[in-house]
A protein has these predicted regions:
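Compact, charge-rich alpha-helical regulatory domains located at protein termini
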Residues: 1-90
């Protein structure tokens, strides 16, 4: 069974996002889901080639799995408790 840490360490490439969104995040040094959720949404406004469509795509993907920006370890634990079925499936 996967753990919250396993989910936190999922590669951003496993999120089924566009190549542009993935490349923009890689240029920001983001490689994992935990690194992504640790960022402020405003951080994405400064990135070259990161337009509104890419920002919306990333935000939508996070929201679809119950995640958000600026998550702390406590937020992740709360998420894990509420999304145990999702963790088991992924």
């Amino acid at each position: 069974m996967r753990t919250i840490n396993d989910v936190m360490n999922l590669s951003i490439e496993d999120l089924e996002l566009s190549v542009r969104s993935i490349n923009c995040m890689k240029n920001m040094g983001i490689r994992t889901l935990a690194e992504l959720t640790g960022k402020k949404q405003e951080d994405f406004f400064k990135i070259r080639n990161m337009g509104k469509k890419s920002q919306a795509e990333i935000t939508s993907k996070l929201e679809a799995i119950g995640l958000t920006y600026e998550m702390t370890n406590r937020d992740w634990l709360n998420w894990g408790v509420n999304h145990i079925d999702w963790i088991k499936l992924h």
